[in-house]
Amino acid sequence: MRISCVGAGPAGLYFAIVMKRRNPNHEIVVHERNPAGTTHGWGVVFWDDLLATLRTNDPDSAQTIADQAVPWSGQVVDVEGQPPLHYVDGGYGICRRRLLQILVERALALGVDVRFESEISELSQVADADLIVAADGVASRLRRHRADQFRPQIEAGRNKYIWLATTQPFPSFTFGFVPTSAGWIWFHAYSFKEGVSTFIVECAPETWDGLGLGTMRADAALKTLESIFAKHLDGHGLMSRDGHGNRLPWLSFRTLVNRTWHADNVVLIGDAAHTTHFTIGSGTRLAIDDAVALASALSEHDSLPRALDAFSRRRQRALARVQREARLSAEWFENLPRYIRYNAPTFFTLLLARRSRLLKRMPARTYLYLRRKYTKLTASAASPLARIGGPAHRFGSKARRGISGAEPGTPCH
């Protein structure tokens, strides 16, 4: 099969790797419009479930990724004016640029033709391909050409956020919340290589405007943020990968859904097909899962239309719950003042429960009361709820047992 992948992110590269491993006779070209080594963001975060998927589908690149990743241990939630809370958990961070380098090197070693500075803006440029894989991100040009068939919907979130980095080490995944004269502002931080940590800053638009962050020059905005988070940075500075017109590249998260993921011989994967809010930390894992699922569908079916239809249905079903929880998580942070007025342990419980549909629909105190009642009911082995499992999803699978008993491997970011 002749395959053209447009976009050399994790989804496009890993699909090429898996397909080439399954059948070396496939002719696969990956087109990337940017020069080699170009990337956005700093580090990405993942857990053992992704490593297991990588080891199953390509042990060689999985081992390299595991060797390059930086483990972090535990999570910390630090609300200014209250004692920090610690949560037992663990995961990994890795430099996004290094992750892409590993995947490019592996793809090349398998015989994939990876072409940088190769811009594909029209489907006619890859018309000779049997299969065209659009892995060109949330602003996919290829998707735009078939918008009437894919029927994408993009919804911009309310909060402002920016991906920064710092030389301050964060050995635990850390949330820090700081009040300002314009409202609350917070960060999510984790180490991704020795001496460098990702530092994502988020706030409501009123806080962003009130602090002047949208109008300041990049250097002044960084100094303002360094001052706000001085206790956490401990003398270390903040770094931005780029600025637009001497301004920091603040964003509003765009949630993307498509009615269908394939049209004729064009199929969407990764951020071209879907996005999930960064506060659930699933973007890289979902991109890899798309790649593996597409390769599997192509191997299982003897016709391209049936394979693409099976892939689309399988992944859209798998994504439905994740996307719903991501929306709830984003909305929780957009309504932070509703929750942060509670003491630190209660706030942490609400943070862990942010994917609960019930929490969104009722006052926090009512939710906490019902959750306590539910916990007591299910504590007894004789309880009917305990025997059948009960409506756990309504109380948040991570929150129903409280902070210390939250399920392992399901962090609060």
What are these regions (language model features)?
Residues C5-R21, V133-A134, R247-L328, W332:
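Conserved mid-domain beta->alpha element of the FAD-binding
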Residues A11, A36, A139:
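Conserved Rossmann-like nucleotide-cofactor binding loop
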Residues K20-G41:
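Glycine-rich FAD pyrophosphate-binding loop
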Residues R21, S296-H413:
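C-terminal helical "tail/cap" subdomain of flavin- and related membrane-associated enzymes
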Residues P35-T53:
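Conserved N-terminal glycine-rich FAD pyrophosphate-binding loop of Rossmann-like flavoproteins
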Residues E105, D128-P249, F253:
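Conserved FAD-binding catalytic core of PHBH/FMO-like flavoproteins
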